[in-house]
Curated annotation (Swiss-Prot):
This is Fatty acid-binding protein, intestinal. GO terms for molecular function: long-chain fatty acid binding. It is found in: Cytoplasm. The lineage of its organism: Eukaryota, Metazoa, Chordata, Craniata, Vertebrata. Hexadecanoate binds at W83, R107. Tetradecanoate binds at W83, R107.
Length: 132
């Protein structure tokens, strides 16, 4: 699958504002904007393994498409949700455990980049990754 591989964050759009709307404090927002995130994605049929490594943490997430699972963001925000594959895009719908609000996430390959889009409470952000 096209998502397989190692991806390093190259640039972000509106990411600090997105983190602010998510309730991340200013210190963590400033640090998060420069986290040097690297993502390794491996797909085996409907099963995915995603390894994230950054300045703040290293984590491995395993999930099966369309199957709910729990996940914690780098700031500790806990979510429940699932990923779906549609039109060569990974679409994630996650609900925050603390307030019940929904975070939408999309991962898609555009050209030679992995574009990850977040939408929360009307605020959209993108993180663009290059193979690395």
């Amino acid at each position: 699958m096209a998502f397989d591989g190692t991806w390093k964050v190259d640039r972000s759009e509106n990411y600090e504002k997105f983190m602010e709307v998510m309730g991340v404090n200013i210190v963590k927002r400033k640090l998060g904007a420069h986290d040097n995130l690297k993502v390794i994605i491996q797909q085996d049929g409907n099963n995915f393994t995603v390894k994230e490594s950054s300045t703040f943490r290293n984590i491995e997430i395993k999930f099966t498409l369309a199957q709910p699972f729990e996940y914690s963001l780098a700031d500790g925000t806990e979510l429940n949700g699932a990923w779906f594959l549609q039109d060569n895009q990974l679409l994630g719908t996650f609900t925050r455990k603390d307030n019940g609000k929904v975070l939408q996430t999309t991962r898609q390959i555009i050209g030679d980049e992995l574009v990850q889009t977040y939408e929360y409470e009307g605020t959209e952000s993108k993180r663009i990754f290059k193979r690395g």
